């Protein structure tokens, strides 16, 4: 059994924010794989199903980003699972838009959702890092992640959510590198990883 956590902030005010791309991917997994209806528990919303024969619970913490760890800890405690069975899908400003990387453990790079989760369950969980680009200067990061995806960005966001959801069974099976590779190749094939498309809208990619 594995716990897939999507990070974001609750409410319509935030639903299209870059910070909410974790929610978006988790929602797409539930839709595309016929998971159960969402229900309120563990200080969030959960949906149950299976990916490639592996039992999965999806969790969207409704605590707001900075307290996401409380919901994750409650769910992990209920299911008696360790860090190794937790995968967290989150926005990553250090990656160009549409880029995906997967890693276990490591730093939190200033991400308050990851900071909260690490404080509650430890640091050695899987992170699925979903690139949303960097605004170019540190002072603009807050407004960037809490800003909505631009209209020009929506095609790659939709494609990334669909492709990540279609290949999520690889994460369920522990094939993290294969997941990242398949997502990269599929996004590249759709033309979303071309150099001239990495700089979505007026955003600059951090060097």
Swiss-Prot record:
Active site: 19 (proton acceptor)
Subcellular location: Cytoplasm
Keywords in alphabetical order: Cytoplasm, Hydrolase, RNA-binding, tRNA-binding
InterPro entries on file: Pept_tRNA_hydro, Pept_tRNA_hydro_CS, Pept_tRNA_hydro_sf
EC number: 3.1.1.29
CDD domains xref list: PTH
GO biological process: protein quality control for misfolded or incompletely synthesized proteins; rescue of stalled ribosome
GO cellular component, as recorded: cytoplasm
Gene3D superfamilies: Peptidyl-tRNA hydrolase
Reaction(s) catalysed by this chain's protein: an N-acyl-L-alpha-aminoacyl-tRNA + H2O = an N-acyl-L-amino acid + a tRNA + H(+)
UniProt xrefs under SUPFAM superfamilies: Peptidyl-tRNA hydrolase-like (SSF53178)
Binding residues for tRNA: 14, 64, 66, 112
EC class: hydrolase
Site label Stabilizes the basic form of H active site to accept a proton, positions: 91
Marked site: Discriminates between blocked and unblocked aminoacyl-tRNA: 9
GO molecular function terms attached to this record: peptidyl-tRNA hydrolase activity; tRNA binding
Family statement drawn from the similarity comment of this UniProt entry: Belongs to the PTH family.
Subunit structure: Monomer.
Known function: Hydrolyzes ribosome-free peptidyl-tRNAs (with 1 or more amino acids incorporated), which drop off the ribosome during protein synthesis, or as a result of ribosome stalling.
PANTHER family xref list: PEPTIDYL-TRNA HYDROLASE
Annotated protein name in UniProt: Peptidyl-tRNA hydrolase
Naturally occurring in which organism (per UniProt): Rhodopseudomonas palustris (strain HaA2)
Organism taxonomic ancestry: Bacteria, Pseudomonadati, Pseudomonadota, Alphaproteobacteria, Hyphomicrobiales
């Amino acid at each position: 059994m594995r716990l897939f956590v999507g990070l974001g902030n609750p409410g319509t005010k935030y639903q299209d924010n870059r910070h909410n791309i974790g929610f978006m991917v988790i929602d797409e997994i539930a839709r595309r794989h016929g998971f159960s209806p969402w229900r309120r528990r563990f200080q969030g919303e959960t949906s149950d199903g299976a990916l490639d024969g592996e039992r999965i619970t999806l969790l969207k913490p409704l605590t707001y980003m900075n307290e996401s760890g409380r919901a994750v800890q409650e769910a992990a405690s209920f299911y008696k699972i360790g860090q190794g069975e937790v995968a967290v899908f989150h926005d990553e400003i250090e990656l160009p838009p549409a880029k995906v990387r997967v890693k276990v453990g490591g730093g939190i790079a200033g991400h308050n959702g990851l900071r909260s989760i690490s404080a509650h369950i430890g640091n050695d969980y899987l992170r699925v890092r979903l690139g949303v680009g960097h605004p170019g200067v540190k002072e603009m990061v807050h407004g960037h992640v809490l800003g909505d995806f631009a209209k020009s960005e929506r095609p790659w966001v939709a494609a990334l959510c669909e492709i990540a959801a279609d290949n999520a069974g690889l994460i369920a099976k522990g094939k993290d590198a294969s997941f990242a590779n398949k997502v990269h190749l599929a996004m590249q094939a759709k033309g979303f990883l071309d150099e001239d498309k990495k700089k979505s809208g007026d955003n600059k990619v951090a060097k």
